[in-house]
C-alpha cells in the first residue's frame, strides 16, 4: 500500500496562538480529547510522538507500526495578512492508507477542520465535555445518514447557514445553526455545543454522533445515554 498525503489550507478566525492551543491542548473541543507532552519527542496520545513543537507556528506528531506503516499529522500556522485574529493553517495528513480509503479520509478531514474553525470562532479556550456514541450495526445500511436527518427534522431544503430548532436527545428543542451538510456529515451549532453527525455507510461503517458540550455542568454520561437510546430506537 503506497503512502499518500492529504493536504488542506484553511483560514481560521483566530490568532496563531489560539489555533496552536486548539490543536494541542483543546482537541476535545473539535476532534476528541487527547494529551500532548509539550516538547519534541514527547508523547502525543496513545503511541504517538511529537515531531515538531513551535508554539504559535508548528505542531506535528507521528506514529509508526509494523511493515513500515506510519501516520503523521502536521499543523503549520501563519498569521493572516490583514489581522492578528486570522490564521492560515496548512494541515497535512501523511500515512499508508488502505486501497480506497483516501476519499473517506479526505471527507473526514474537511469535516474535522470545519469543526476546528467553529471551535476557535465560537468557543475558543472553553473546556468541552466530549461525548461520542455509535448507532447499531444496522446503521451501516445505505440511507442511514438521511434517516438521522429526517428524524432530526432537517429537511432536504434546509441549507448551511439556516437557523433551525432541533429536538436534541437529552436536551429537547433548541435553537441551532446548520453549519455543515454533505451526503454523509452534518454539523449543528447551538449556543453551548457543537453536534456532529457522521454517516459512514459509504465506507462500510455505521452512524456515530459526537457532542462537544461547552455548558457548565455538562454531563457526558447523561448525554451519551440519551443519544444512545435515541439511535438504538431509530435503528431498531
For each feature predicted by the language model, list its residue ranges.
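Hydrophobic ligand-binding cavity/cleft-lining segments
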Residues: 1-37, 103-160
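Short, glycine/acidic-rich beta->alpha junctions
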Residues: 4, 42, 69
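Well-ordered beta-strand positions in beta-sheet-rich domains
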Residues: 7-9, 47, 72-74, 173-175
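Short loop segments at secondary-structure junctions
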Residues: 16, 53, 80-81
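Short, exposed beta-strand/loop patches in secreted or surface proteins that constitute
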Residues: 34-38, 48-53, 77, 155-158, ...
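Short, hydrophobic/aromatic-rich segments at coil-to-beta transitions
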Residues: 37-43, 52-62, 161-163, 181-187
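Beta-strand/loop substructures that line and gate deep hydrophobic ligand-binding cavities in soluble
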Residues: 58-108, 179-236
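Non-catalytic interaction/regulatory modules that flank or connect domains
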Residues: 142-193
Amino acid at each position: 500500500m503506497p503512502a499518500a498525503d492529504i493536504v488542506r489550507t484553511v483560514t481560521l478566525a483566530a490568532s496563531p496562538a489560539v489555533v496552536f492551543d486548539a490543536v494541542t491542548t483543546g482537541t476535545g473541543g473539535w476532534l476528541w480529547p487527547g494529551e500532548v507532552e509539550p516538547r519534541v519527542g514527547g508523547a502525543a496520545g496513545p503511541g504517538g510522538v511529537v515531531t515538531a513543537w513551535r508554539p504559535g507556528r508548528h505542531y506535528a506528531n507521528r506514529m509508526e507500526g509494523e511493515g513500515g506503516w506510519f501516520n503523521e499529522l502536521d499543523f503549520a500556522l501563519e498569521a493572516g495578512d490583514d489581522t492578528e485574529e486570522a490564521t492560515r493553517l496548512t494541515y497535512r495528513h501523511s500515512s499508508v492508507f488502505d486501497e480506497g480509503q483516501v476519499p473517506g479520509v479526505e471527507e473526514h478531514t474537511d469535516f474535522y477542520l470545519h469543526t476546528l474553525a467553529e471551535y476557535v470562532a465560537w468557543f475558543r479556550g472553553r473546556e468541552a465535555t466530549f461525548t461520542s456514541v455509535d448507532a447499531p450495526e444496522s446503521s451501516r445500511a445505505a440511507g442511514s445518514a438521511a434517516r438521522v436527518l429526517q428524524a432530526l427534522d432537517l429537511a432536504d431544503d434546509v441549507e448551511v447557514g439556516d437557523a433551525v430548532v432541533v429536538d436534541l436527545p437529552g436536551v429537547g428543542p433548541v435553537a441551532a445553526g446548520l453549519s455543515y451538510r454533505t451526503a454523509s456529515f452534518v454539523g449543528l451549532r447551538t449556543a453551548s455545543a457543537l453536534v456532529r453527525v457522521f454517516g459512514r455507510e459509504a465506507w462500510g461503517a455505521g452512524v456515530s454522533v459526537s457532542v462537544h458540550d461547552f455548558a457548565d455542568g455538562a454531563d457526558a454520561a447523561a448525554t451519551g445515554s440519551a443519544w444512545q437510546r435515541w439511535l438504538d430506537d431509530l435503528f431498531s
